[in-house]
A protein has these predicted regions:
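Noncatalytic, basic helical substrate-engagement surface that gates or grips nucleic-acid strands
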Residues: 1-130, 134-156, 241-257, 261
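Non-catalytic nucleic-acid-binding/docking modules located in mid-to-C-terminal regions
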Residues: 45-50, 81, 143, 160-289
Length: 289
């Protein structure tokens, strides 16, 4: 399951723009994405691939709950802040994915995370989620063989995220990760969190009380072990804590198309034509091989 936007943003910033003339179209994100996919497919031999897509990068229903959600990334209107040279490549990326036999899958009013969450939930044969987004750690499930191939350090330095990884790094289980993120907040998504509660305190609360509902119940119990300072902060954040979990947790029951049952079947002629037209033939050859 590809978090496609996460990958093409990484490709755009990680692959040099080698245009030789000012009027040549930018292609570094597209070629970089193809090279990433070639490496992933070569090294992991997936039985099938789904390119999950942001049909709405900032769904209104999430904004209605937390107004600051991704607010700092809005360029104008409701469009995401994105370099023009990357924006120009989105149609090329879509066309290349279609040519590969991996057409993007998006659901109106939802993010790629929600598409990924749904496929990961309904899969019955193990799933690798390829992303640079920690939010998807909430999907990790050893029993169902769902793990994250975390690309924050680059595609050549993938971190394999399983339950032990999440526990060692954050002190919580994957099923507690979304609640920890709610308490801690996430500046990259515009989530304020609860003042005075960082990652370690959030993890400690969840270990003591199980989940966010357990923490909230403990806040109302004067005999619980929550310190007066933390109790006061949690009480003051009641409205946020009521709304944020729905924003942070990925949707897992979208009406997605049936997952492919085998490896992608590329349209070689289309891919070669794209490679020739945009000067990315080397990347096309690598992924076809």
């Amino acid at each position: 399951l590809l978090d496609t936007a996460s990958l093409y943003f990484r490709a755009f910033y990680g692959v040099p723009d080698t245009r030789r003339t000012a009027d040549a179209p930018p292609t570094n994100a597209a070629s970089g994405l193809l090279d990433m996919l070639a490496r992933l497919i070569r090294e992991h031999r997936p039985g099938a691939v789904v390119a999950c897509w942001d049909s709405d990068w900032r769904p209104q229903w999430r904004v209605n709950l937390i107004g600051s959600y991704k607010e700092h990334r809005v360029a104008s209107g409701d469009k995401e802040e994105m370099p023009d040279a990357l924006q120009e490549q989105i149609p090329l990326i879509e066309a290349a994915l279609v040519g590969l036999g991996i057409p993007p899958v998006g659901i109106p009013d939802h993010e790629a995370d929600d598409v990924i969450g749904t496929y990961a939930t309904i899969a019955d044969d193990g799933v690798d989620v390829v992303t640079g987004d920690r939010d998807l750690f909430q999907l990790v499930d050893d029993a169902r063989r769902v793990r994250v191939l975390y690309t924050a350090r680059g595609i050549s330095k993938i971190q394999y995220v399983d339950e032990a990884f999440v526990g060692d790094k954050y002190g919580v289980t994957p099923s507690q990760y979304a609640d920890m993120a709610t308490l801690r907040g996430d500046t990259s998504d515009g989530l304020p969190g609860v003042p005075g509660i960082g990652e370690k305190t959030a993890a400690s609360l969840l270990r003591m009380f199980g989940d966010l509902d357990g923490v909230i119940t403990a806040v109302g119990d004067p005999t619980s072990s929550i310190s007066p300072r933390i109790r006061a902060s949690l009480l003051a954040s009641a409205a946020y804590l009521s709304a944020a979990p729905t924003v942070v947790r990925v949707v897992r029951d979208l009406p997605v198309p049936a997952a492919p049952t085998g490896p992608p079947g590329p349209d070689v002629a289309l891919l070669e034509a794209i490679g020739a037209e945009f000067g990315i033939s080397n990347s096309v050859k690598r992924i076809l091989s």
